[in-house]
């Protein structure tokens, strides 16, 4: 029996409990009828119930899926702590091809597993999943967030995310140039999706000059036309050329891993401030940027606006309250910049220490959510 237990505790060549040592709970979800195979990871509920999206991806094996969900859920703990919201970190992954493996039955089965956690985990859309998928999950559980307005939710999260990027850019300008004005500066924006396009619009309104790149020609033409209406200038460049333009701030709003050994030598900017997730290819690249004299705004601080809206939705949607809370990104980022300089560490280290201090300051776990409680960022009535 002992030998059998020892054998069953292995995943790949690693002991499963060693692999999940930093996490509270891992739930393997298997429903043979619908074909569902999913993993829910709850990293830390010290600050509150776990919050994190559900992505669907054709992972090669369970090891790869587990590795991804462990990494992503831990990241959510720090994101929630950085945003100073009363939630912890969680994430879910569904193993499958989102183009051909989806079905109403699969998402209803997933909803049942989420419901079984009885409020320890709240989830919504992520890469490979849409709200149309979660309409089916909602038939089985109420622990779904990030809901469109027509379903009683708070709607498009790209609005507060973009606003958070603007506050982050203003804070960076204040730190570097002594004024938080956006005008008179040049920004290199990579990606004009839902967030990047809104950021570009606001920068143009402020009188900034832009270098932009995107894989879709129609959005490039659209923002070029906007510049004629709003002022400022827009220069369209090829994808690889965005790294080497002469600008004040690089604003990555598309893919992750773009700050790496190949791109850093090309950068001619004073700072990197954008909404893209996991911008650093490796943690050591924060040091490389630092050595080159380029200020880095940690991505999970910059893009916290969307997370703030998702968390706020659980108290009852309130756009004014969300934007008020999102404004705190300005102050938080300035604190991180100043602390990093004071301690002679990278901004990533400073941000992580700040988050860890927040978590350690909460001595007891708060694994369940109370809808009767007002958020601490509530607008005074």
UniProtKB/Swiss-Prot annotation:
Annotated residues that bind NAD(+) are located at 55, 126, 157, 161, 191-197, 214-215, 254-255, 275-277
* Active-site residues, as the UniProt record annotates them: 91
InterPro entries linked to this entry: Aminoacid_DH-like_N_sf, Glu/Leu/Phe/Val/Trp_DH, Glu/Leu/Phe/Val/Trp_DH_C, Glu/Leu/Phe/Val/Trp_DH_dimer, Glu/Leu/Phe/Val_DH_AS, Glu/Phe/Leu/Val/Trp_DH_bac/arc, NAD(P)-bd_dom_sf
Role of this protein: Catalyzes the reversible NAD(+)-dependent oxidative deamination of L-phenylalanine to phenylpyruvate.
Q: Does the keyword Cell membrane apply?
A: no
> Which GO BP terms apply?
L-phenylalanine biosynthetic process
Keyword Mitochondrion in annotation: no
Under catalytic activity, the entry for this protein gives: L-phenylalanine + NAD(+) + H2O = 3-phenylpyruvate + NH4(+) + NADH + H(+)
Can you name this protein?
A: Phenylalanine dehydrogenase
EC number, as in UniProt: 1.4.1.20
- Which principal EC class is assigned to this enzyme? oxidoreductase
**Record-listed L-phenylalanine binding positions:** 79, 277
Question: Mind telling me which CDD domains this protein's record contains?
Answer: NAD_bind_Leu_Phe_Val_DH
Organism field: Lysinibacillus sphaericus (Bacillus sphaericus)
MF term (GO), any: phenylalanine dehydrogenase activity
State the SMART domains in the record. ELFV_dehydrog
Pathway assignment = Amino-acid biosynthesis; L-phenylalanine biosynthesis; L-phenylalanine from phenylpyruvate (PDH route): step 1/1
Q: What are the alphabetically sorted keywords of the record?
A: NAD, Oxidoreductase
Q: Which family does it belong to?
A: Belongs to the Glu/Leu/Phe/Val dehydrogenases family.
């Amino acid at each position: 029996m002992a030998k059998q237990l020892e054998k069953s505790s292995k995943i790949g060549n690693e002991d499963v409990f060693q692999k999940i040592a930093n996490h509270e709970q891992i739930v393997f979800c298997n429903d043979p009828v619908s074909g569902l195979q999913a993993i829910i990871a709850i990293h830390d509920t010290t600050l509150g119930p776990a919050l994190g999206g559900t992505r669907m991806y054709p992972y090669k094996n369970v090891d790869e899926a587990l590795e991804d969900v462990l990494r992503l859920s831990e990241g959510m703990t720090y994101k929630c702590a950085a945003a100073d919201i009363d939630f912890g970190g969680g994430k879910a992954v569904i193993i499958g091809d989102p183009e051909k493996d989806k079905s109403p039955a699969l998402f209803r089965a997933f909803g049942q597993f989420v419901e079984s956690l009885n409020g320890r985990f709240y989830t919504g859309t992520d890469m490979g999943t849409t709200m149309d998928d979660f309409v089916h999950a909602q038939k089985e559980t109420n622990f779904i967030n990030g809901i469109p307005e027509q379903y009683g939710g708070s709607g498009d999260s790209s609005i507060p995310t973009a606003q958070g990027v603007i506050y982050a850019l203003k804070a960076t300008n204040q730190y570097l140039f002594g004024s938080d004005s956006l005008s008179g500066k040049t920004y290199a924006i990579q990606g004009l999706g839902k967030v990047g396009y809104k950021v570009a619009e606001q920068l143009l309104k402020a009188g900034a000059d832009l270098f932009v790149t995107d894989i879709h020609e129609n959005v490039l033409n659209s923002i070029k036309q906007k510049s004629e209406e709003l002022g400022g200038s827009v220069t369209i460049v090829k994808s690889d050329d965005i790294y080497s333009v002469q600008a004040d701030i690089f604003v990555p709003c598309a893919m992750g891993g773009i700050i790496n050994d190949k791109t850093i030598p090309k950068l001619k900017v004073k700072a990197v401030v954008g909404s893209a997730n996991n911008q650093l290819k490796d943690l050591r690249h924060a040091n490389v940027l630092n050595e080159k004299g380029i200020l880095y705004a940690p991505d999970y601080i910059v893009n916290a606006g969307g997370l703030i809206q998702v968390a706020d939705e659980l108290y009852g949607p309130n756009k004014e309250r969300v934007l008020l809370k999102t404004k705190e990104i300005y102050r938080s980022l300035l604190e991180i910049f100043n602390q990093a300089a004071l301690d002679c560490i990278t901004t990533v280290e400073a941000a992580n220490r700040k988050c860890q201090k927040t978590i350690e300051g909460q001595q007891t776990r708060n694994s369940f959510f109370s809808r009767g409680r007002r958020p601490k960022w509530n607008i005074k009535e």
